[in-house]
Amino acid sequence: PHILNDICHTNNIKLIHLSTDCVFSGNKGNYKESDHPDPTDKYGESKLLGEINEGTSLTIRTSFIGPELFNKKSLFEWIKSQKNTEIDGFENAIYSGLTTLTFAQVIENIIDKHLDLSGVWQVSSDSISKFELIKIINQKFNLNIKINRNSSFQCNRSLNSAKFKKKTAIKIPSWESMINDLYNDS
């Protein structure tokens, strides 16, 4: 990303780079941009090293869920593949990402109205447990999955995007609304 940033800077091109909530360990949640990143794996470490926080470049920390074109290995695709089965839903795994559809709309809004944003900004939804998220997807997509509450895994990588929302006035829909839009788009 840093080489790409240099090329963009040289050619007066705006770079919008994507980072992840995985730059944080998940030990506390509600992370702000000012919180010290503490990744716990190579993915989080590599994404942190790639963040651009200089010049006119924009790094967006976020996470998203939605359909995949090829691999079909994302959380969303896995949930859909569990139709008519029984699975565990982690009630202490807290998530604040967006659907891919909503994220695309946010990026479009940034390009159209907020191209002056630069530095590292976090974009997130209201926090939700993976258990509750699976319930919403299960209901909307009529998957007939029996979801068991599981509290054995704990991770809260929820992001606080109050700064972004205040600066841009971009409103992130509820999880019910985002999943409904994803359903209607499929």
Range-by-range predicted roles:
Residues 89-94, 121-128, 167:
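Glycine-rich Rossmann NAD(P)(H)-binding loop
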Residues 143-186:
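C-terminal amphipathic/interface module of NAD(P)-dependent oxidoreductases
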Residues 21-41:
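Active-site "gating" loop of Rossmann-like NAD(P)-dependent oxidoreductase/epimerase domains
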Residues 15-21, 60-62:
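SDR active-site strand-loop-helix element
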Residues 1-4, 43-51:
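Conserved catalytic Lys-bearing alpha helix of Rossmann-like short-chain dehydrogenase/reductases
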Residues 40, 52-95, 100-102, 108-109:
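NAD(P)-dependent short-chain dehydrogenase/reductase
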Residues 104-109, 113-161:
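Mid/C-terminal beta-alpha module of Rossmann-like enzyme folds, strongest
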Residues 1-16:
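NAD(P)-cofactor binding segment of oxidoreductase domains
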